[in-house]
Each structure stands twice: as C-alpha cells, then as structure tokens.
C-alpha cells in the first residue's frame, strides 16, 4: 500500500512534465543582438517598375572579438574559395559561401530579369557564391529559406553566372551596393574589405511593363481625364510599342465625350499616331485642325513648322510659319519661324529682315546667340549687313 502511494505522486509529476513540454516548446524566443555582431541589412533598387531586394547579414572585417582580419578574409574559412565542408548540414564538402553571415542571403525580384545576360524568373532566391582569386560563380538557389549554405543542393539551382572580382575602396562591413543604374538595368556589387564583385541585372521589357500598368490604370480613376489618355498614347508612340492600341488612346483623349478634350496637344498626338499607323492623309488633316485650334500657341505652331522642315517639307513649313504670324502677330518666336522658313526657300533678304526682328525679341542669351549666328550665315549668303 505504501509503495503504491509513493509511485502515484511520481507518475503524476512525470505526466505534468510531459504535458508541459509542448507548451514550453511553443514559447517565443528572446530578442537579442545578432550573433557575432553581424548586422541585419537590406538594400532595394528600382529598375523601372521592377523592384530588386537583397536581404543579408553583414559581417565586419574586425571579427566578433575585435581581431583585425584584413588580408585574412578571402580564401580562408571566413570567405572560402570554391566549395567547402562546413562541418554541419547536409551539403558535405559541396557547400558554397553564403555571401554574408547567419541566415541565408536572399535575392528577390518582383519581375523577370536577366542576370549577366541570363534569364531569372521573378521570385526569391538564396544568393550564394563560389569565390575565387580570378573568377567567381554567382548562384541563385530556389531554396532561400534554409540557414546559410549548410543545406545547399545543386539540384535546386535556378541560375549560375560568372563574375569578376575587382579591387575597390576599403569596406569594413560586407555590403551590397548598386554601383551603376540605368533606366533598364543596374549593377550590384558585393563589397567587403578591399574587394568588390559586380554583376548586372537587366530588364528587357521596361516599356511593356509600363504599358501593362498603364492599361490597368486607364480602366480606373486615372482614366477619367484626357491628360492621362494623351500621355499613354505619347509613351507608346515614343517607344514604338502597340501603335494601333495607342491610336485608340489618342482618339479617346481627343474625341471622347466623357474623357476627351479636343485641343492642340490631343490633336497633335492623334496626328502623330495616325502617321505612325500609315494614315498620312488623316494625319495631315488632323494637324491642320491642330494648328488652327484656339489652344495652339505660337511655340506649338513654330515647333510643328520646324518638324516639317526636318522632314524636308519646306513649303508646308512656310505656310505654317505664315499661319503663326497671322494668329500671333509680332510674338516670339513668330519672326524666327519666318526667318528660317524664308531661308530654306532661298529668300535670303526676307529671312535676314525677319531674323533681325527676332533678335530684338529674343528672351534669353541662348536664343539671342542662335539668332546672331543665323544672321551671320544669312549675311554671308548674300543678304545685306545694313
């Protein structure tokens, strides 16, 4: 009887411990400083609508205990060359370097991109490296959730590309820096100690991405005004993309009773897109309406005349310059247009007279110098210097 009484409390205590174990396991951990003084860091770069982010832990040249590791980083256990056996995990002697510290270094792109010219789909990837004195291999692994590179598996590679290490300014902390930026590409470099390893990230279809976004926006509140329809049409025209669709946008901007407004800007865009779609006669008629429209200012008409001159249509250009003079007499840059129009038709004396009138109206030094140069050319061509 006594033996059973002793056993019963022991059994109860053991059961209590077993029941408590899951609850203890579910307790949250503490928030403490990062291991080894490796700072958590992140960098994001926009390439048009594309967003590229690298999340990483950043070790420093002076190690956790303060020792100076300068000259002892590359090709050592700190940042080993090639594959190595890290003594832990499942990668054996085929473990790349994680390009940072602690957790996996993660490369995320919102859209498909090209790395060093090779395609990489949108998504998140473990960013790993096979370092070397002359050449590196940059690995994008589909596994971005494992700790470090301890569980690396080459079968999970999404992409491998080559990169060249370069000497660089000293960097105490391992850093990922976007060192070159263009509208459709950027170069990111891993920088640490006296070395950097750059690789390019490019977006082939920047204009297509913007046009996809524009299509969505025109179906919402941005589509409630003519300015956005006109801007969308202009963007497609400038990039020579979806010109037939853009013509529809231009028509919406200039004619729609709900969204549109007929003015010089919308008619000029419509004319440009009619021309781009092979409708030359429609474009000419539309542009005639544009320059005759009450909203057509003297600079608008002058620019159209200069555009015609650039196309070799000097007689048409002269008619436009004369229309400008009729609509906006003695206003800048009407006399400039008449000077250039007459000069293109060989009427040197008339051109010189208009140029002198334009010189008196020049609004700034740049325009004044341009007209003075034109006057000298006309005088040398046989006009009077009086």
Which residues does each PLM region occupy?
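N-terminal secretory signal peptides that target proteins for export/translocation
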Residues: 1-8
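Bacterial N-terminal signal peptides
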Residues: 9-21
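Boundary at the C-terminal end of the N-terminal hydrophobic targeting segment
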Residues: 23-26
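Extended, well-structured beta-strand/loop surface patches
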Residues: 55-122, 128-228
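A conserved position within tetratricopeptide repeats
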Residues: 214-221, 254, 258, 291-292, ...
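Alpha-helical adaptor scaffolds
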Residues: 227-252, 257-258, 262-334, 340
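Short coil/turn linking the two alpha-helices of tandem helical-hairpin repeats
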Residues: 238-241, 276-278, 346, 366, ...
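Terminal, low-structured helical/coil segments at or just beyond the last alpha-helical repeat
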Residues: 298, 352-386
């Amino acid at each position: 009887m006594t033996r059973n009484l002793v056993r019963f409390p022991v059994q109860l205590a053991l059961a209590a411990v077993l029941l408590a174990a899951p609850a203890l396991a579910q307790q949250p951990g503490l928030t403490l400083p990062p291991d080894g003084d490796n700072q958590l860091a992140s960098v994001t770069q926009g390439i048009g609508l594309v967003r590229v982010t690298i999340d990483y832990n950043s070790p420093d040249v002076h190690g956790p205990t303060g020792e100076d590791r300068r000259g002892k980083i590359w090709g050592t256990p700190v940042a080993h060359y090639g594959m190595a056996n890290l003594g832990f995990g499942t990668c054996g002697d085929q473990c790349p370097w994680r390009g940072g510290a602690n957790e996996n270094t993660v490369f995320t792109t919102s859209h498909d991109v090209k790395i060093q010219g090779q395609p990489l789909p949108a998504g998140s990837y473990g960013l790993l490296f096979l370092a070397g004195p002359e050449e590196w291999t940059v690995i994008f692994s589909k596994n971005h959730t494992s700790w470090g590179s301890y569980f690396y598996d080459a079968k999970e590679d999404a992409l491998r590309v080559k990169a060249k290490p370069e000497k660089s300014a000293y960097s105490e902390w391992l850093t990922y820096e976007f060192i070159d930026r263009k509208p459709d590409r950027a170069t990111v470099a891993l920088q640490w100690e006296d070395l950097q390893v750059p690789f390019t990230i490019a977006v082939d279809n920047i204009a297509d991405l913007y046009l996809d976004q524009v299509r969505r926006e025109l179906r919402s509140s941005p589509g409630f005004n003519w300015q956005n329809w006109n801007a969308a049409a202009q963007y497609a025209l400038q990039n020579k993309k979806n010109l037939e669709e853009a013509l529809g946008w231009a028509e919406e901007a200039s004619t729609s009773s709900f969204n549109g407004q007929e003015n010089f800007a919308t008619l000029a865009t419509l004319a440009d897109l009619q021309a781009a779609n092979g409708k030359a006669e429609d474009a000419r008629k539309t542009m005639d309406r544009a320059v005759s429209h009450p909203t057509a200012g003297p600079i608008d008409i002058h620019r159209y005349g200069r555009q015609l001159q650039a196309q070799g249509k000097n007689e048409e250009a002269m008619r436009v310059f004369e229309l400008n003079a009729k609509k906006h007499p003695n206003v800048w840059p009407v006399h400039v247009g008449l000077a250039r129009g007459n000069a293109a038709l060989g009427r040197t004396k008339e051109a010189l007279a208009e140029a002198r009138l334009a010189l008196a109206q020049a609004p700034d030094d740049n325009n004044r110098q341009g007209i003075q140069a034109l006057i000298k050319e006309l005088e040398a061509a046989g006009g009077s210097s009086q």
